Amino acid sequence: MLGLITGSGLYDIPGLEDSRTKEVPTPYGSVHLTLGTWNGCPVAFIPRHGTAHRIPPHRINYRANMRALDDAGAGAVLATAVCGGINPRYGVGEMVLIDQFIDMTHGRETTFFEDEVRHTDMSDPYDGDLRRLLMEVADSEGLEVVDGGIYVCANGPRFETPAEIRMYAGFGGDLVGMTGYPEVALARELDMPYAAIGVVSNPAAGLSVEELSLEDIWGVLEDVSTPLHLLLGGAATRLADRW
């Protein structure tokens, strides 16, 4: 089974067959999974913010989501994350396969190992095989996808200041968002292959003369939804024979 976790603007899967909802209890809370078959591949789907976009980034129950997917039998997870662009190489509407992260969050529950000493290797947090598969899909579908980018996870829910963005750029950050961590680290703790597609919705704070507009961001997400579904759907097709 393929786990799918989507961010802002993606609240359903077009073409999902045999769709049904299942409540999965975990030690961290219950999670409502949407189960079904997409392009021949069994999938379990979670929209991070809820179907009505009511859960802010710092209140998402990341541990429950990842444990629910693991308990449901997911063998890998593909995720999307809406980002501001720090590196000018990444234009608005760009899809980026994230390969490293920088954690700037605070106050989140970030590990399954609260009561034991465990140091999980984060040298390659995003699965290389999944990233290569996504690039193969992009090539076959004629989609423009950038392979590699450093994602800075800010806490939210506010947007970042220009001073913070300058600091993140100095750290080497290419993208900034609010939801990519601790999801990726939890996947590593579960030994679950995980890949994330960053979608650049806007230049980060202070990098554009135009004021940051939520309406503009939603417009970009609407435009990129079709190629993003093609990318995810193509991956599901290629992974169908695994499960």
For the regions a protein language model found, what residue spans apply to each?
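Active-site rim beta-loop-alpha module in soluble metabolic enzymes
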Residues: 125-170
